[in-house]
């Protein structure tokens, strides 16, 4: 489990094709702690397993399914990646619960710079729209963000200066793909409510007594 608070930004240093996926070498340096073989790390929001490591970085493999459902397939040598190690007992949950299981890939529509921060507008895949609500949480490239507004299937997310400083979200351009993971709590709520197969919307929540 992760929090969506990025620890550091790494760089893709090597990519090898495998019979059933790809192997990636990531150059990075965390502020504290050492790697362990088998450790879980979120790479742009994708939970991967450390297979090899040294003081300069680590190596992991991604299956064809993972590549198909995430932006890892588009990574090239030199590209940046957000990195976060899994939560440990006693750690603070500063963002929101992020599993590292990417639900789908969204598309950047616009990055609007403001005097302080920026607004990131993303087209949300139709299959995920019922889970994305105003003031709710959404993980974008592994970063825990709050949805500022929803309009016609698009989500606007406010990027504060600290987020722009600690992530590469400010480098995104129109048309870029981004890994999306919706709030797992929304999935649990849907699974418990009647008529869940039709998804959740504001009208259904009112019918069921919420708000």
Predicted regions and their residues:
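Conserved loop->alpha-helix
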Residues: 1-211
């Amino acid at each position: 489990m992760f929090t969506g608070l990025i620890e550091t930004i790494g760089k893709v240093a090597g990519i090898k094709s495998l019979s059933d996926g790809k192997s990636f070498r990531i150059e990075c340096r965390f502020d504290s702690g050492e790697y362990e073989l088998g450790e879980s790390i979120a790479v742009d929001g994708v939970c991967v397993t450390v297979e090899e490591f040294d003081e300069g970085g680590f190596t992991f493999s991604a299956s064809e399914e993972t590549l198909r459902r995430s932006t890892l397939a588009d990574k090239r040598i030199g590209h940046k990646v957000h990195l976060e190690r899994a939560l440990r007992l006693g750690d603070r949950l500063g963002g929101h619960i992020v599993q590292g299981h990417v639900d789908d890939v969204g598309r950047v529509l616009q990055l609007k710079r403001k005097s302080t921060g920026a607004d990131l507008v993303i087209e949300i895949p139709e299959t995920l729209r019922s889970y994305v609500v105003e003031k709710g949480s959404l993980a974008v490239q592994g970063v825990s963000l709050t949805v500022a507004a929803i309009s016609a299937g698009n989500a606007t997310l406010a990027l504060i200066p600290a987020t722009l400083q600690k992530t590469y979200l400010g480098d995104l351009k129109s048309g870029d793909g981004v890994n999306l993971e919706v709030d797992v709590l929304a999935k649990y709520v849907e699974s418990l409510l009647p008529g869940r197969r039709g998804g959740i919307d504001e009208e259904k929540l009112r019918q069921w007594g919420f708000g």
